[in-house]
A protein has these predicted regions:
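Catalytic core segments in nucleotide and nucleic-acid processing enzymes
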Residues: 4-129
């Protein structure tokens, strides 16, 4: 909301044109067959599903990141296309570096909750594209 985005009611998003429109977001909605914590419609009209994950140990990070968020990212890319969705994770806590690299290789863009400037900068960078 601090970027000027408006929250809209959650709905099931079955095609790339459904769901929040440019400058809007919704919480807890289905994108395809998988639930996303937040879905943002970027200024360039791509969808950015964001998974919020907290891990208290590097062992736990496999479950949170690789077995959940990265699997969802792969599904979303397969269903909607790599040019139409930007799957992301907003992370807090302890994560194994190898698990982070594997998640990125699966198509997940990673941001950290302790520093929200990069995700805000990315979202703003889609303006005028």
């Amino acid at each position: 909301q601090s970027l000027g985005f408006k929250e809209v009611p959650a709905s099931t998003i079955t095609t790339i044109v459904k769901g929040p429109q440019e400058g809007e977001f919704c919480s807890e909605c289905y994108l395809g067959n998988r639930k996303a914590d937040v879905v943002v419609r970027l200024h360039d009209t791509r969808l950015m599903p964001i998974e919020c994950k907290v891990s208290n140990s590097s062992t736990n990070s496999v479950k949170r990141l690789n077995n959940d968020a990265a699997v969802k990212a792969g599904d979303w890319i397969k269903k909607f296309g790599a040019l139409q969705v930007v799957p992301a994770a907003l992370l807090a806590g302890v994560f194994n570096v190898l698990n982070l690299e594997q998640a990125q290789d699966a198509g997940l863009t990673i941001f950290w909750s302790h520093d929200l400037q990069p995700i805000g900068d990315f979202i703003e960078s889609t303006r005028g594209i």
